[in-house]
């Protein structure tokens, strides 16, 4: 049995899609649907059961899991970089993850954890996923810090020898529609361009970057789940790994690709960055991918323009935009 936490969320539901593509339906989806629209991510998917997060955690605490678990793909977390409730993040992103990791170590199940590129802070220490760099990182927000704390715990307790913790960079693609302000700029741009014919980006607050010239490592969600599938097939590959393309692109590049995919000429305006983001905004991210490549991962990452075009034309513009 495969357990996917956050299985109704963005990357989690994409992982359920990938498992289905590989002929696997013995899947338990763990999530907290509440009043969100996440349930729509599951309509096209095949799985044997859905369990609420709190019920699942009670099962874990009391050793009452009714399944023979092959792997836990742990994508369940609060992923809002603007979340300010530190206690909530500690409980949801740190303690929850540690419990699942210990469960898998005890039972021999594969454990794949979602870390984040937010752990890299302002990027002044670079974006290397080696252990020495990890020990020195200073995240800019509580979300990144909660992810950093799990990686540090796993390192300190010797757990990184038996798990894979993945630092996802800027992920975009289908099934992110429920995320509100945390949706990718591609998703937001498609709606804004369709309604107004223009896309607005934040002005740069960094002297080294022009407006819209701030750079991110944008990775297509289908590539993320290809990496996770490969890790499921290669349980001897363990540690903290970056999951990006290794090639940073500008916000202007990204938005221009959306306009092109919509067969429109780019019209971009720049607005002031909100005060609460200043000093906490990464002007540049680019994954160092040597570690994953050296481990033998064969996944070829989708070029930005190709990924954006597929996302826009095959999903955002479709009657059924879901995987």
Curated annotation (Swiss-Prot):
Q: Which domain of life is it from?
A: Bacteria
Cofactor(s) the protein requires to work: NADP(+)
Name the InterPro entries for this protein: Epimerase_deHydtase, Heptose_epim, NAD(P)-bd_dom_sf
Q: Which UniProt keywords apply?
A: Carbohydrate metabolism, Isomerase, NADP
The UniProt catalytic activity note for this protein reads: ADP-D-glycero-beta-D-manno-heptose = ADP-L-glycero-beta-D-manno-heptose
EC assignment: the record states 5.1.3.20
- GO biological process: one example: carbohydrate metabolic process
Is NADP set as a keyword in this record?
yes
What CDD domains would the database entry show? ADP_GME_SDR_e
What is written in the cofactor note of this entry? Binds 1 NADP(+) per subunit.
Q: In which pathway does it act?
A: Nucleotide-sugar biosynthesis; ADP-L-glycero-beta-D-manno-heptose biosynthesis; ADP-L-glycero-beta-D-manno-heptose from D-glycero-beta-D-manno-heptose 7-phosphate: step 4/4
Which sites are catalytic?
A: 143 (proton acceptor), 179 (proton acceptor)
Q: Name one Pfam family in it.
A: Epimerase
Q: How does it assemble?
A: Homopentamer.
- Domains: what does the record tell us? Contains a large N-terminal NADP-binding domain, and a smaller C-terminal substrate-binding domain.
Recorded hits in PANTHER family, A to Z, give: ADP-L-GLYCERO-D-MANNO-HEPTOSE-6-EPIMERASE (PTHR43103:SF3), NUCLEOSIDE-DIPHOSPHATE-SUGAR EPIMERASE (PTHR43103)
Its function?
Answer: Catalyzes the interconversion between ADP-D-glycero-beta-D-manno-heptose and ADP-L-glycero-beta-D-manno-heptose via an epimerization at carbon 6 of the heptose.
**Family assignment from sequence similarity:** Belongs to the NAD(P)-dependent epimerase/dehydratase family. HldD subfamily.
Name of this protein: ADP-L-glycero-D-manno-heptose-6-epimerase
> What is the scientific name of the source organism?
Nitratidesulfovibrio vulgaris (strain DP4)
């Amino acid at each position: 049995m495969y357990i996917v936490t956050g299985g109704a969320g963005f990357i989690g539901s994409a992982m359920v899609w990938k498992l289905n593509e590989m002929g696997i339906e013995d899947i338990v989806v763990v999530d907290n649907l509440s009043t969100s629209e996440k349930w729509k991510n599951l309509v096209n998917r095949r799985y044997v059961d859905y369990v609420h997060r709190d019920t699942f955690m009670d099962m874990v605490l009391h050793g009452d899991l009714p399944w023979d678990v092959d792997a836990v793909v742990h994508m369940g977390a609060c992923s809002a970089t603007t979340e300010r409730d530190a206690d909530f993040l500690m409980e949801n992103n740190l303690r929850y993850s540690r419990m699942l990791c210990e469960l898998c170590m005890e039972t021999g199940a594969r454990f794949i954890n979602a870390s984040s590129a937010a752990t890299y802070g302002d990027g002044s220490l670079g974006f290397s996923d080696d252990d020495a760099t990890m020990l020195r990182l200073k995240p800019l927000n509580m979300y990144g810090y909660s992810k950093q704390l799990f990686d540090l715990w796993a390192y300190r307790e010797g757990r990184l020898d038996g798990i894979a913790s993945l630092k996802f960079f800027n992920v975009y693609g289908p099934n992110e529609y429920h995320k509100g302000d945390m949706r990718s700029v591609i998703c937001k741009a498609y709606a804004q361009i369709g309604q107004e014919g223009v896309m607005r980006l934040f002005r740069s607050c960094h002297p080294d970057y022009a407006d819209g010239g701030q750079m991110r490592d944008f990775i297509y969600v289908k590539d993320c789940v290809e990496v996770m599938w490969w890790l499921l097939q290669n349980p001897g590959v363990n540690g903290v790994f970056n999951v990006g393309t290794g090639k940073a692109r500008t916000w202007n590049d990204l938005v221009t690709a959306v306009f092109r995919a919509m067969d429109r000429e780019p019209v971009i305006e720049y607005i002031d960055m909100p005060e609460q983001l200043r000093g906490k905004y990464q002007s540049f991210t680019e994954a160092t991918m040597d570690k994953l490549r050296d481990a033998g991962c064969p996944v070829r990452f989708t070029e930005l323009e190709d990924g954006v075009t597929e996302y826009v034309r095959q999903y955002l513009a479709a009657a059924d935009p879901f995987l």
